[in-house]
């Protein structure tokens, strides 16, 4: 059953990658090929308004603006996500283990979780800004 679930997710991911007309080539590279945008390149680094952050691919709400903070990393950072919106896996791409997180709804890659964030969680969700859509609270 787990193998079947994995295969279905993989097929859906491939379909979304090829057919989502709302995504740029750069977004597709990061969301589906686990790329990384250059640090400091996202306008969301400077976003201070109240609102929420959503997956650029499927629109699921991932973060509340109240959990965003300036980490100094060059990427939009949050100390907490909304409950049950991400799945994680271990990434060894750069020579050591990191925890990578993906949207649970569409399997799109967003970034990595580090254990150097502020309280109350001590976590830093280091997110590629290009993978997020900010929605202003009305």
Task: Go through each PLM region and give its residues.
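N-terminal amphipathic/basic-hydrophobic helices that include classical n-h-c signal peptides
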Residues: 1-15
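A short Gly-Trp-Pro
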Residues: 15-138
């Amino acid at each position: 059953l787990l193998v079947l679930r994995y295969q279905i997710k993989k097929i859906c991911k491939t379909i979304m990658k090829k057919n989502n007309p709302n995504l740029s080539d750069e977004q597709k590279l990061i969301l589906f090929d686990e790329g990384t945008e250059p640090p400091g390149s996202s306008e969301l680094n400077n976003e201070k308004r109240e609102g929420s952050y959503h997956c650029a691919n499927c629109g699921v709400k991932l973060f509340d603006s109240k959990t965003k903070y300036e980490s100094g990393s060059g990427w939009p950072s949050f100390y907490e996500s909304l409950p049950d919106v991400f799945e994680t896996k271990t990434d060894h791409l750069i020579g050591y283990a990191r925890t990578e997180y993906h949207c649970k709804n569409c399997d799109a890659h967003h970034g990595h979780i580090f254990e150097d964030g502020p309280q109350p969680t001590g976590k830093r969700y280091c997110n590629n800004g290009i993978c997020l859509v900010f929605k202003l609270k009305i």
